[in-house]
């Protein structure tokens, strides 16, 4: 069985893989020593724009307000689709027993990982790597002290809430400003 490690950036994934002994390069990930190590390339998926909810919202109109999605939708950047597909395949592999969230230690890293995890339809156990240094010893120490992913549920919810608030504010203010010009 494998443990799948998902980092936020390819460079971080390569550093982690080197310490873990996952040196075999594959398409979109590294493998070896019981580990699969991949990456998100930053925000692979983001909240969809208003037109995804209703084509009428493509043009800002005061009459349409407020736009408050009941179920939020996400889009995947076309230039990042291949990497998302790789992650989804890895997350769904039957020989993957656990997923390690190795995205950046913080609110955005938590959001990036959890969004991909959810969109992939994964329900495997999550552990959290929380490190602030890419020194080999710090990486080893971090993997020795992995924490259950559920301990970061609040951080994820805070990040998701902030992201939705940003979406609402950006939609209302930027489109209104464009419309006034």
Where are each of the predicted segments found?
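Intrinsically disordered, low-complexity regulatory segments
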Residues: 1-171
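Single conserved hydrophobic/aromatic residue that forms the stacking wall/gate
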Residues: 172-181
């Amino acid at each position: 069985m494998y443990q799948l490690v998902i980092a936020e950036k390819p460079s971080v994934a390569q550093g982690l893989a080197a310490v873990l002994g996952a040196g075999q390069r594959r398409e979109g990930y590294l493998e070896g020593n019981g580990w699969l190590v991949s990456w998100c390339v930053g925000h692979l998926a983001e909240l969809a724009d208003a037109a995804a909810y209703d084509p009428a919202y493509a043009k800002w109109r005061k009459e349409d307000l407020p736009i408050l999605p009941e179920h939020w939708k996400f889009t995947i950047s076309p230039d990042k689709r291949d990497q998302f597909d790789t992650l989804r395949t890895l997350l769904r592999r039957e020989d993957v027993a656990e997923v390690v969230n190795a995205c950046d230690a913080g609110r955005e890293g938590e959001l990036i990982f959890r969004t991909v995890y959810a969109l992939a339809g994964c329900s495997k156990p999550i552990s959290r790597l929380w490190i602030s240094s890419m020194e080999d010893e710090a990486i080893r120490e971090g993997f020795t002290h992995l924490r259950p992913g559920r301990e970061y549920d609040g951080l994820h919810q805070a990040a998701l809430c902030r992201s939705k608030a940003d979406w609402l504010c950006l939609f209302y203010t930027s489109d209104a400003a464009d419309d006034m010009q």
